[in-house]
């Protein structure tokens, strides 16, 4: 998603946080699909404590689904809940056209 890279570039250049950790997590998972927790964390600029708090809240709120890894059950893979993925896709299509979704 070019939009996410643009926003991250602006944040770096301005030395300011422009979007929430929630936004970073949602759009990372939208663009990349199911991802291990450490990959999701790397897509944010959150500290470990802030990331754990945010991902826990988003899961409890039904925005994310989580599964244990197949090869290593300690690995937690996160993904968008299907209704959330559908909503983001619909909003992107509505505001940016079909190619954006």
For each of these PLM feature ranges, what is it?
Residues 9-46:
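N-terminal helix-turn-helix DNA-binding core of bacterial DNA-binding proteins
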Residues 34-76:
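Canonical helix-turn-helix DNA-binding module
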Residues 1-16, 76:
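N-terminal leader segment of winged-helix/HTH proteins
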Residues 26-29, 63-64, 80:
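Generic leucine side-chain signal with a strong bias for well-ordered alpha-helical environments
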